[in-house]
């Protein structure tokens, strides 16, 4: 096994990545948007984080004779293109004593090896994100329970994926004992750990769950790495009410942990269901072959599934000509231009990704959130530049400058704006890249980027000018002394004559 990870696996991954290059690559803007969404949710419990996903069975070549390397490369490409949840259908081959992905010749452990390679390659502050693997067993496997009880399922998981990356039931219990778990109302002994702690403190990446068949396994297998079916709220599109039309409906849904919605969706409806608080599991196959007609379709599906805040072409610190002209027509107290600030663009007639780039010096109202209540909003009566958002008087008493951090919060904001009879409005939200270009962060206009050290140009000039002046003076002094010589050499012969004359007058011997 060690030899596989040290030699065979890296070579396979390299060949797989070469083959994966036929997939359409993400733009820089798409990468910034995905990272921005992750960072917005750092203090959200992991059970409330939207996890774009699909049924793996529907996305792989549907033949038992399909090329294994090609299928594993497809899985790796899906991971690299932002898929965070997989419904994995498993079947147990009694004669081989092995678990396989249903309908394929791919061993489950090989699929886990692929996930492990991806996790190792992306285990950085910039790229790390949570993954969920939801396991479902076919009917033949469920009927063959006696043979399965002899198999050590936990050993299969540990063979395929490093246990250090897996968030276990014991990890959850420990975090609850340490008061490190959250609900929508703050710390809770029945909640889940926040995304930031999950990724960067306890350094986990993967959550396993059973969708059925947990009773097939021994107690050791049940109580170790895989959470039981009752942990997850897994439903189909026919069993929900959407859209949510009141804050009460939103609060009711938010009490449900790990919400997954399985269905055959069109990309135009992804945001509609995301704002109902569900992680989507697509059952309709996404054609991953990148011929001239499929590449654009795949990109459209992925961007619509992954993004609920920014458009796929934002953020990029630039605006197109139409947006630029819109800003020039708006009122502004300054001639300066800085497209580094986030605004929410609300239109009652379109449920589009609402975040956009705005000129920080433009005058707009501010979005205000009530204390620590996730779903209560207000729009300030006063307008101002983004840099004035630090003014405590901008928001009503009890409110502070805010931003929607989940699709559910975004839906609650739309409900508030609709109740206020607002048809069309742009307003500032608490997200910007002022400190470092394309590092989109919250915390007001003076927040610093966690990924890059920053010093303002003004402060840099203030620090370097005195040093430069002193260095210049010292340089001039050096040049002066090199140019104007002190006449020590010229007087040496004269001194020698004086000393010789004095020596002649001296009396040799001891004076009497």
Curated annotation (Swiss-Prot):
Primary subcellular site in the record, as a coarse category: membrane
Asked if Glycoprotein is a keyword of the record, the answer is yes
Compartment list: Membrane
Instruction: Output the Pfam families linked to this UniProt entry.
Output: TIM-barrel_MTC6
Membrane-spanning residues: 461-481
Cytoplasmic compartment spans: 482-512
Quote a single Gene Ontology cellular component term.
membrane
Under InterPro entries, the record lists: Telomere_Capping_Maintenance
Source domain of life is: Eukaryota
**Which residues are noted as glycosylation sites?**
43, 67, 93, 139, 152, 179, 239, 264, 290, 311, 378
Sorted keywords for this record are: Glycoprotein, Membrane, Signal, Transmembrane, Transmembrane helix
- Which residues, if any, are the signal sequence? 1-20
Residue numbers on the Extracellular membrane side: 21-460
Membrane protein topology class: Single-pass type I membrane protein
* Family of this protein: Belongs to the MTC6 family.
Q: What does this protein do?
A: May be involved in telomere capping.
Family matches, as PANTHER family: MAINTENANCE OF TELOMERE CAPPING PROTEIN 6 (PTHR35518:SF2), MAINTENANCE OF TELOMOERE CAPPING (PTHR35518)
Protein's name according to its UniProt entry: Maintenance of telomere capping protein 6
Q: Which organism is it from?
A: Kluyveromyces lactis (strain ATCC 8585 / CBS 2359 / DSM 70799 / NBRC 1267 / NRRL Y-1140 / WM37) (Yeast)
